[in-house]
Design a protein with these regions (language model features):
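Alpha-helical DNA-recognition elements
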Residues: 57
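Amphipathic alpha-helical dimerization/coiled-coil segments
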Residues: 27, 85-119
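N-terminal helix-turn-helix DNA-binding core of bacterial DNA-binding proteins
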Residues: 8-50, 70, 74-77
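Residues within the DNA-recognition helix of helix-turn-helix
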Residues: 54
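Glycine-centered, phosphate/nucleic-acid-interacting loop/turn motifs that mediate DNA/RNA or nucleotide
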Residues: 62
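Short beta-strand "wing" residues that participate in macromolecule-binding interfaces
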Residues: 66
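N-terminal amphipathic alpha-helix
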Residues: 1-20, 93-94, 98-102
């Protein structure tokens, strides 16, 4: 007999998206093809090792495409696959929810401070 967790399809989605930097990487790639150095500049806190690791995982999941050009110096570009582009509406909703959540928390933090002062 299947448990409710067995039928939960959120888990496979989270396996693809969870990673400290994956959502930031996807955000930049939804705005166009990027080179490694462009991604690193866009996410200054990420190390080269971590960026490489996160890019590899996304590539293995067919979310992004890595293209190596046979030139000197080496040129590598990353872009969204057609399959990866199906995540865009989900990420847009997550972005909106995150923005709303920040505003909500700020409002509630301010009212909490006001309540504490009045006590």
């Amino acid at each position: 007999m299947k448990s409710e967790l067995d039928s939960c399809r959120v888990e496979p989605a989270l396996e693809v998206l969870v990673g400290r930097w994956k959502l930031s990487i996807l955000y930049f790639l939804f705005h166009g093809t990027k080179r490694f150095s462009e991604l690193q500049k866009g996410i200054p806190s990420i190390t080269k090792k971590m960026l490489t690791s996160q890019l590899r995982e996304l590539e293995e999941q067919h979310i992004i495409r890595r293209v190596v050009y046979p030139v000197v110096p080496p040129k590598v570009e990353y872009s969204m696959t057609e399959y990866g582009k199906t995540l865009e509406p989900i990420l847009e909703l997550m972005h909106k929810w995150g923005s709303d959540h920040v505003k909500y928390m700020q409002l509630n933090r301010n009212s909490q401070v006001t309540n504490n002062v009045m006590e």
